[in-house]
């Protein structure tokens, strides 16, 4: 990613507080079903199904962050052509594509990767299917900056150590 140097620093420890500010206005795709947490939190609003609310606790944040960080690490280990990052109106959109074989590599390394046929909608969507690639669309701009900052730190460590 050639434009990582443009991203401003963001304190990772403030992420949870910032996320909670965005939750009331977060509107995922109506066709996406929330499968994370208590099923009772999968609600339809005004009969439109345009919003999905869930119980978001620190345990959920840790679990999701672990999966995300492992997948980002896997993206750095495999073919870099699978990684696309671009900027739209100041917001970062990252799409990472992985094939089924790439997932097996990650699992063999002990990464906490999701099982096949899992669909989650939290702060981002990711689709994992045995016959397609994984598609990640990160929705919150604060989340995008945090993720990219993690990559900046990771890449700078690699560069400093000539890895």
Curated annotation (Swiss-Prot):
Extracellular side: 55-117
Cytoplasmic side: 1-33, 139-163
Keyword Glycoprotein belongs to the record: no
Protein topology in the membrane: Multi-pass membrane protein
Coiled-coil regions, chain positions: none
Main location: membrane
Keywords annotated in UniProt: Membrane, Transmembrane, Transmembrane helix
Transmembrane intervals: 34-54, 118-138
GO cellular component, one term: membrane
Keyword Membrane: yes
Annotated compartments: Membrane
Extra information: Partially overlaps YOL100W.
Name of the protein in question: Putative uncharacterized membrane protein YOL099C
Species in which this protein is naturally found: Saccharomyces cerevisiae (strain ATCC 204508 / S288c) (Baker's yeast)
